[in-house]
Amino acid sequence: MLGIVISAFLALGGTLGAAAAGNSVAIDAKVIDGEVYVKAASLLSQIGGTGTYNSSTKKYTYSPNSIIPDVIKKVSPSVVAIIGKPADEHSSNRFSLAHGTGVIVKSDGWIVTNAHVVKDMDKIVVVTADGKEYAGTRKQIDYTSDLALVKINATKLKIAKLASNPFKVQVGESVIAIGTPVSFSLRNTATVGVISGMNRSVTSDYNLLQTDAAINPGNSGGPLVNLKGEVVGINSMKFVDVDIDSMGFAIPADTVQYVLDHFYKYGKVKRPSLGLELEESWSAVVGLPTEEPMTVIAVSSANAGKAGVKAGDQLYSVNGKQVASAVELNELLKAHLPGQTVDVTLLSDGDLITKKLVLSESLAN
């Protein structure tokens, strides 16, 4: 018998095809008499669903119908509801409450949610999936990414798993949103949809995922999960209008992990900045594909001034990577820290030049 590894495109139609979403997976396999065999348990762990073997008929029956319920059952214990009174001294109405959703990221009571959920919330109460109530404390908050950390006094909580490779998320991939829409009595509501779009900037400083899974008030801070039960995003916002349907947005897992890493290590996001006020081209503003550079409106840091950058220069690239919008620049700078040096390529006085620029710390938050 020969032990091999196969990479199979798992598109078997219907729900299963949605589960695979075009991703390939590597599974240990063996070749017996020229036929390739894999363990059913290994296959199910990748594509979900259930399978049973009938020893009498020697038939193996696969059922994809349990994929979504299984994912919801797996993830829901890691989802919490968050409620509190708005911190408004003029609000005396006892029914004046704000609520949202959160995701457990550490078993000792650390919960990630949206900054806009808890920024003005007083006397935070967190309710876990088993109905237990805890007093919550806002620990870190980052308005730029719209993410925050809340702490409760609890142990042995089930943590959610962030997508191991968030960059493999694809348009058309099935996803599930879990949260607390509209009313606190609707905790752990699940809605199903697909990834509708990638790299959406909308009104965010970073790229967002677009989904048609129903996102309603109160879903903010809850997880958007794939059919492996991995969190691919944190639900954040939606477009609302009489002529608009099913346009929700989530903060991608890579941005969530970036912010969490900074929260844990620094207690805040140490966000780098070029120290420049930049204006996007008309094409970039309206969302057209463009290679037009951004224009320097003002120099706002001493480091940028020392580098010789001046108003009117046009920024083409940073470290050799073209940037045509503020979001593209912000995404690129996630790999850097204040104090590090980058190469900036600019058109200045008719000449295309590259300068060394020391990154400043952004004060945007």
Describe the predicted segments one by one.
Residues S63-D70, P86-W110, N114, K132-A135, ...:
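A conserved glycine-rich beta-strand in the N-terminal activation segment of trypsin-fold
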Residues P86-A87, K106-S185, D205-N207, K321-V327, ...:
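Conserved active-site neighborhood of the chymotrypsin/trypsin-like protease fold
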Residues E89-L97, V117-I124, L157-I159, I178-G193, ...:
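Active-site loop architecture of trypsin-fold serine endopeptidases
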Residues P77-I82, G102, G109-T113, G136, ...:
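Terminal peptide-recognition signature
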Residues I67-I72, L227, V231-G287, I353-K355, ...:
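C-terminal cap/linker of serine protease catalytic domains
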Residues M1-N65, S76-P77:
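Primary recognition of N-terminal secretory signal peptides and signal-anchoring hydrophobic helices
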Residues T57-N93, T101, K123, Q170, ...:
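N-terminal activation segment of mature serine protease catalytic domains
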Residues D88, A214, Y264-L332, Q340, ...:
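PDZ/PDZ-like groove recognition
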